[in-house]
């Protein structure tokens, strides 16, 4: 399976960064730095996929090219 597109953006309200995977509903994570947010969302992705497999739910294919985009402040 190809990898998923990841967005990383700063959150002034949370004083850190949020990363999300648009293809996996509600799969997002927070980190104090972009690198921490990326590591956290990769852990969240693994948990999301494991839960979907365990519950025999469909796993959506990636709709976007695998990339990591970061919005700057």
Positions of predicted regions on the chain:
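Short aromatic-glycine-(Arg/Gly/Cys) micro-motifs in beta-strand/loop hairpins
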Residues: 9-24
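A short, exposed loop/beta-hairpin motif centered on an aromatic-Gly-Thr core
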Residues: 25-36
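Short, charged, surface-exposed hinge/linker loops at domain edges
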Residues: 1-5, 35, 39-73
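Flexible, active-site-adjacent loop/turn segments at secondary-structure boundaries
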Residues: 22, 28, 57
